[in-house]
Amino acid sequence: MVIDLVVTKTDDGYTGEVPSLKDCESWAHNEDDVIDKCVELVRFYANLSDETEMKIDRARRSGKKIIYKLIFEK
């Protein structure tokens, strides 16, 4: 399964959201932390175990937005 993670640089940090999962969004002071928090939320909302391998691929950048692809087996 492949889903998008959108990370946006804001004035006070970074926000991350997964548009395909309702209410799956987070905020952090740095990019790595917001990615980690969003991955944890994806695991929760998609009912994935901690052992499920997830690859994070930086796909593209558009202005202040960075699009990542989260790749995992469901």
Named regions from a protein language model:
Residues 22-33:
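A short, exposed loop/beta-hairpin motif centered on an aromatic-Gly-Thr core
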Residues 2-4, 25:
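Well-ordered beta-strand positions in beta-sheet-rich domains
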Residues 6-21:
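Short aromatic-glycine-(Arg/Gly/Cys) micro-motifs in beta-strand/loop hairpins
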